[in-house]
Amino acid sequence: MSERDSGSSGRAKAAAAVAAATPRAKTSGPAPFGAFVRKPVEKAEGKAKAQVANAGSGAAEMRMETVESWPADAVEVGAIVDAYGLKGWVKVAAHADAGHGGDALLSAKRWWLIKGQERKSAPSLQAKMHSDSVVAHLGGVTDRDVALALRGSRVYISRSEFPALGADEFYWVDLLGLDVVNVAGVNLGKVADMIDNGAHSVLRIEYPDTDKSGKPVIGERLIPFVGVFVKTVDQAAKQITVDWEADY
């Protein structure tokens, strides 16, 4: 799963709903980092418009990469699942729909790929939506056989190439690690994951706790990312304020 606040905070109001990306591989569990959630006061409009991305500057061919050359802000956004057609296009199962974070695959100039221990990158010459998948032509992928050899590759995009979001919209990856406090100022823990339960996004928060024997354990809280509970998201302060009691 992973989130950007394009404003200074994401203030929620009374009537709240959250739009979250629909993971391709699963419908619950940790959030795919390519997804985003809108501010808790606003419903998503499902703008899954087809887009085409043309490669800009840089080498036109695929190249080998190392851990050292890998971008520090690389975010996993999908996986290559098959070849598409005969001319070297690949089919990608994105972690998020276009309009819900999957646009990064359509707009990025360069894709970064991991398969096993092998790392590669290639310019995205063209990418577009096809049904519920993304299909793309990468530099150096000249025919179907080369495309088939990329099956199973995990696809990463540099966070700096993610599309800009509207006010009070957040990429999940940018919410991870933020402190969560309630309106009374009580620290509830840190965001460990985001979960999409099909109806809305859920913050999974971890905090230090003890079991019945007094042994230190990691506690967990699940707080729906909806306006009735989420009051502000302040990325500058690395803090989310919620209307949620510590003993809930």
UniProtKB/Swiss-Prot annotation:
InterPro entries: PRC_barrel-like_sf, PRC_RimM, RimM, RimM_N, RimM_N_sf, Transl_B-barrel_sf. Transmembrane segments: none annotated. Residues 167-248 form the PRC barrel domain. GO terms for molecular function: ribosome binding. It holds the Pfam family PRC_RimM. It comes from the Bacteria. It is found in: Cytoplasm. Keywords: Chaperone, Cytoplasm, Ribosome biogenesis, rRNA processing. One of its GO terms (biological process) is ribosomal small subunit biogenesis. SUPFAM superfamilies: PRC-barrel domain, Translation proteins. GO terms for cellular component: cytoplasm; ribosome. Residues 1-33 are annotated as: Disordered. The keyword Heme does not apply. Residues 11-27 have a biased composition (Low complexity). The PRC barrel domain binds ribosomal protein uS19. An accessory protein needed during the final step in the assembly of 30S ribosomal subunit, possibly for assembly of the head region. Essential for efficient processing of 16S rRNA. May be needed both before and after RbfA during the maturation of 16S rRNA. It has affinity for free ribosomal 30S subunits but not for 70S ribosomes. HAMAP family: Ribosome_mat_RimM. Belongs to the RimM family. NCBIfam families: 16S_RimM. Binds ribosomal protein uS19. This is Ribosome maturation factor RimM. It comes from Paraburkholderia phytofirmans (strain DSM 17436 / LMG 22146 / PsJN) (Burkholderia phytofirmans). The lineage of its organism: Bacteria, Pseudomonadati, Pseudomonadota, Betaproteobacteria, Burkholderiales. The gene is rimM.
